[in-house]
A protein has these predicted regions:
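Catalytic phosphate/metal-binding cores of nucleic-acid and nucleotide-processing enzymes, i.e., regions
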Residues: 1-116
Length: 116
């Protein structure tokens, strides 16, 4: 991803996800790049967001990266946030594997599920 394009997408995501959130503790923040132990582009607790603004989608690679960076950050869920060409931020894609979706759903329902 071109650095300026990626930075713009990260900032647009942060701003969109923070709309209407007045609690500073709930706000999404952009992370500084940390190299080999990267913690993702966005701190959106309980998620780590990996922002992608690219022409060719590698969903498996994006999700694996998001999950790895969530583990590095010590948060439960990773999500790839993919820019959709010629569309607004809200029309982008939030992609996770089914295992993560299952865990998110269980948390929302307040039930336990085994960590796969």
């Amino acid at each position: 991803m071109h650095k300026a394009k990626g930075t713009a997408w990260e900032s647009a995501l942060r701003d969109y996800l923070n709309e209407g959130l007045t609690d500073r503790n709930a706000q999404v923040r952009r992370n500084a790049q940390t190299g080999v132990n990267d913690i993702g582009d966005l701190d959106a607790y309980p998620f780590t967001g990996e922002a992608k603004a690219v022409k060719a989608y590698d969903l498996a690679g994006f999700v694996e990266q998001a999950n790895r960076e969530a583990r590095n950050a010590g948060v439960p869920f990773g999500v790839a946030l993919i820019k959709r060409p010629r569309k607004g931020v809200g029309d982008g894609y939030a992609v996770m594997d089914v295992r993560t979706f299952r865990r998110v759903r269980a948390r929302l329902l307040g039930v336990d599920t085994p960590d796969d």
